[in-house]
Each structure stands twice: as C-alpha cells, then as structure tokens.
Amino acid sequence: MSFKYFVTNDINIPQYTLTCLLYSIVMIQFKKLINAKALYQEPDRIWVAKGMTFFAVDYSGKRISCVFNVGGMKDRLLGCHRLSSQLLRVGLHHLLPLKNGNILVTAKRRTYLYDKDGNVLNVWTGYQGNKPGHQGVCVTPEGTIFFAEYLLNPNRDHDIHLWRSIDNGMTFNVVKTWEEGDIRHLHFVKWDKYEHCLWLGTGDYGDNGSENRLYRSADSGETWELVGQYSQDWRAIGICFTEDALLWGTDAGSCSDTVHFVRMDRKTRKIEIIQDFEGPCHGCASFAGGRAFFSTGVEGGENEKDRYSRMKEYHDGRCENVWKLEKDCWPLIV
C-alpha cells in the first residue's frame, strides 16, 4: 500500500489517491469525492479512472465528460476488482491531455490515443514492461511527449529506452538507449518549469550504486547531462521542483540503506540529506509557492520502520506527516 501523487506540468496542483479512493485537499482537510483513481488534474476538472474506463469530474465529484472505454472485455472484467487489477497490473495508469486536444492514456503494455469524442486514434505497443513508473510519462509545453521504459530486468539483460513523440502521440521513436548491463530501468522523466528542461532518473543498484542516476536535458531529449550518480541517495522514483532546489525521497525500500529525504541545490548541484523517512518514497507532487507533498509505502524491506503508509507535507525546509494508514491484508505488491 502507498499513497500516490500526480501533478500537472503547468498548474502544480496535486491529486491524492489511496487504493481506489479519490480525495481533495484544502488546508490539509480531506474530503472523499468519488470511488475512482485520480490520473490528472486541471483547473476545472479531475480526470479519473474506474477499472478500464476514464472520465472527468468536477470538484464536487460530478461527472462532466463522456465515459471513455479502454481495451477488451477481459481486461474490463479483471479491472473491476482491486486485487486482480493490482496483481495483474490491469487498469489505467497515466493520462495526459495533449496540446491538440487529444488524450493519451496508458494501460498494461498498451498506450492509447483518444480524441475528445472517445474515438481511438492510435494504439502503441512497441515498448518494454507493463507500464512506466507513475512519473514516467510527461508532455512538454511545446507538446513533445516522453515515455520512460520501466521493466523488472533483474538480470540487466535488456537495453532500456527513452521514447519521444513529436506528433502528438501518433508515433514514438527512441531518443536515448542504455545498453544492457548499464542500468535496471527508468524511474521518471519530468518537465521543469523553472529551468525549462527535462529531468530523468534511473535505478536501482549496481557497484557503489552506479545504476542510481539523475540526468538533465535542455534540448528536448537530444542530449543528456549526468548530474549525479552512486549511492541510494540518487535513487528517486520522482522529484519535486522549487525555485531554488529539487526535492525527492529515496526509493530504497528493499535494501538496508536508510530512506532519506534529499534536497539538491540548483546552483551548486550538491545534495543534502534533510531527514529520514519511515519507508520508501513512492510518490511526490508540487504545489505553487514551494509547497510539496511526498508519500511513503510498505514493501516489506528491512529498513522500513513499521507497516504504515504516510503522506507528508514539505514546508519550511522539512517534511511533516499529515496522514497515515496501516498496510492492509493484501499481499505485498511492488
């Protein structure tokens, strides 16, 4: 179990999901809106998924769009129950409104492109893995889409690819490849509105933590600067942005290293460990004004303090717990 967060590229307002429940947050007060999974938030609506369908609701939870159906009957049946959907990774995982008005959604091993009327324009299956990490897909202000491959790859015997689309999701091409044995997988790719660049993270282990890296690209993915590497402190599942720093929690849930909350100064590129977390950081989201939220999960790792998943708010240089829930009875699912 973990809290997961999603944030738009432009307005920096997070959504919060706990299993299949959607909540809104105002001054750290929670209100249940609808039984659904939050995928993307806009100023006047929240895009949510229920099984293999998605639609938009307003801030009272009322549906304000048509219902989009994804995939075949088998997936729709498996996606109706939480246990089967989690075990088999059935369901919808990402949603991106595109610059031309179309909508990109990811499901298990398939990425769909819809127009506003619910017509399927394209189905892409050329990538490895079931799905990207929860911050593994992004779109830039110019409309370029990036898609980061995430697969288990325990033997490091696969090349790993970063994909890019410059035609609103109709075609994708490899823009960068890590050769087999170099890394395990890609964790995230995110647009930074402050530096007008992309950041990308990899994991998980390697000699002296060599697979844990942070990259930066200022030319739409053509070239990538290696900013940091080595140790579990560079192992991030996602990052948050402030005007003067990058923030992340480490994803060191299945190893002995302490899970840290890390700040990287934009000017010096030096990282500072701010505090310890109780479990691996699985999600994060940025607010306007420098506020950010982070979540921890339960994986059964030796460095976890307890069986609680937590939501934390970052302000005044530190993270404080604002909500926690105990791990449920279901098996651990990474």
For the regions a protein language model found, what residue spans apply to each?
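Repeated scaffold domains used in trafficking and secretory/extracellular systems
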Residues: 32-41, 76-80, 85-98, 129-138, ...
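Short coil/turn segments that connect the beta-strands within blades of beta-propeller domains
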Residues: 43-44, 100-101, 142-143, 195-196, ...
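Conserved Ser/Thr-centered positions that define the repeating blades of beta-propeller domains
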Residues: 56-58, 165-166, 217-218, 312-316
